[in-house]
Amino acid sequence: YAITRNRKKSKFFSLMYYYFISAMFIPFQVIMLPLVVQANAFHLDNIYGITFLYIIFGLPMNTFLYTGAIKAIPEALDEAAVIDGANPIQIFSRVIFPVLKPTTATVAILSFMWTWNDFSMPLVLLSDESQQTLQLAQYVFKSQFSVDYNLAFASYLLVLAPVLIVYIFCQKWIMNGVVAGAVK
């Protein structure tokens, strides 16, 4: 919110925005080897570490989506809240954030889908078999000469179930976001 509203007024916020967005242009494969070395050095090669890394790697896309949505909200809402006596935190929490429900649902769904379906980061960071994700567990069902199809397809259903549950609960906001983006 602060980046979007102050980008034109302050060079700092503009540079911060471009700093976040520039991280989207660096593919994971470029930073994979240094990331593994640093993750091992900082003991981030576990579930907590990979969760932290997912949050950090999700910031650029989430910042991009939120700044685009906040730009569409008229500044007159901010001014009206200031006239009513709201401070900046109240403006964001009581005026701006409720308007951002479709964007928040979109960010949550995209972040969930990205982290849930990711294969590369857990493959290179998680060496302990007890901490592997379901996607890595599916990789085990294929051997050099055969595939255990019964277990493989059962694991596919296990991986699909959370995605369907998230979609069913967020369906209303997904449709609102799609319709809002389609009509000018």
Pin down the residues of each PLM region.
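A structural signal for multi-pass alpha-helical bundles of membrane permease subunits
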Residues: 1-184
